[in-house]
Amino acid sequence: ENKMPGYIGQSGTEDKNAALQSENNIFTCKKNDEFIIDIEDLGTDGEGIGKIQGYTLFVKDALTGDKVRVKIMKAKKKYAYAKLLEIIEPSEWRTEPACPVAKQCGGCQLQHCSYEKQLEWKRKKIQDCLNRIGGFTDIQTEPVIGMDIPYYYRNKAQFPVGYDKDGNIVTGFYAGRTHSIIPFKNCLVQHPCSSAILETVTKYMEENKVSAYNETNHKGIVRHILIRTAQATGEVMVCLIINADKLPYADKL
């Protein structure tokens, strides 16, 4: 057996189930294999990209410059998706997310990356697309112009409504790649008025026993709360997406 560089077995130990090189020297791995890798780049969805002998690993929450321990979750012929287990050496890009639910929530992918590095990553992605896809090798992109305060800037959001395990009405955003709601009303990238609006709507639903929609049995009324703000005028539009012809007790909202 020829064990791969960076391979540390399953559950942290080397064993006979090690990732192998086949006879034609192609790297292979399988679910639950663990590796230590260096993250070299970021993908289009903000996931870290590392390589082992040309084989690509995509690692959520990893950053360029990180040295990490990962576990294979889904292996394909030329690439695999891996789970971040441990940050052995953090990247200079890494910072503490300002949002307390940034890791669970699927709304933001790069809050653990410094804002200056996020802007540099955007510039690099544009440059790569121009060079690799467009063939414009003689064009150089200028630095991305960022915001003075990179929070509370989005003017539109759609918040799903549901129930927690105790039967309480909750709203927030879906966890990544799921329809499980992460209860949170103080999103740092949405307009500050969103928090008060979500609080008002959920209170109205509780007081008037207006149900939230259940995706399993397709019953219930309120599915989403859509909020759009106009930065120039200060106007706010609130729409409730409902599973009914009329919204009960609308006059009390």
State where each predicted segment sits.
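Accessory RNA-recognition modules of RNA-modification enzymes
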Residues: 3-12, 16-253
